[in-house]
Amino acid sequence: SSSGSAVAVAKGLISFSLGTDTAGSGRVPASFNNILGYKPTRGIISNRGIIPACRSLDCVSVFGLQVSDILEVLLVLEEWDPQDPFSRKKKILTSKSFPERPKVALLEDDQLDFFGDSIARKAYDKSVSVLAESGLYPDTVDLSPFLEAAELLYSGPWVAERHLATSPLITDSP
């Protein structure tokens, strides 16, 4: 997980940090620390040198306090790396890569579960209002396809890929 990277930004020790993200290990610590965590499109940032969890899904993630900070980091790091098979030759980012009014995905009401915690529900509703007031565009999404993808990650073919990626490390450094 990249929790240390998230904490360092949240505490103001640094203005941005890098981590890794396969299935949320960059974005989840960011959310727990009230900062932004961004998992870029595969191949924008080279993965050379990271210890793989699931090579086809791993990405270097970026943590920051503002979208503009994250974009600046991405613009610097976006380079083709001939030693990374997923690296992209064509640059796709520009200073205008993020929309002025970004869309924020929210779960449909029938998919929300606060486990009976009315305080958490009120905090969620207030957060949605703050997002809308801050210029972001809240939009609802169906969680079902994401749950199906997660099932594949933890019970499907990617389990074998993770085993292949991590076996040499475990064998060499028990």
What are these model-derived regions, one by one?
Residues G116-L143, T166-P174:
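Acyltransferase
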Residues R27-F32, G49-I50, G116-S118, E151-L153:
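Short acidic, glycine/serine/threonine-rich loops at helix termini
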Residues K39-K122, P145, D172:
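A short helix-breaking turn/cap at a secondary-structure junction
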Residues S144-G156:
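Acidic helix-start/capping segments at beta-turn-to-alpha-helix junctions
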Residues S1-S3, A30-N33, P40, C54-D58, ...:
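Short, solvent-exposed loop/turn segments at the edges of secondary structure
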Residues F98-L107, L153, P157-P174:
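Short helix-loop capping/hinge segments that flank enzyme active sites or metal/cofactor-binding pockets
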Residues S1-S31, F63-Q66, L74:
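Active-site-proximal alpha-helical scaffold in enzymes
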Residues A6-A10, K39, S68-L75, D125, ...:
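Predominant activation on well-ordered alpha-helical scaffold segments within soluble catalytic domains
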